[in-house]
Amino acid sequence: MLILAIHQTPSLTQERYDEVVRRLTGKSRIESPSDLPFEGLLVHAAGQGPSGFCVFDVFELEEAVERFRNALGTIPEEVGIEEPPQFFPAHAAMSVPIERG
């Protein structure tokens, strides 16, 4: 079962997100599944919206969420992100090939 994660909270900023990515991957951006120290993340997107910075993830299974949480550890708290993301099972999902321009 696919698991969705949405993280859009007052303490999540682009700068804090970027620092989490640097600490988690050693890189400035996540561009490939091989950049991550865990398996099972199918979709990752992050960007600035009208209500603040937002991160959206789709995991293949609950076990992948646990691998994600274990890899993150306390990094979010260390950079000042106070609220956790929301996780819930997907009711419906579809995908199309993504072309990068």
Q: What feature does the model see in each segment?
A:
Residues 1-56, 60-74, 81-101:
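Short S/T/G/P-rich N-terminal loop/turn motif that feeds into the first structured element of a domain
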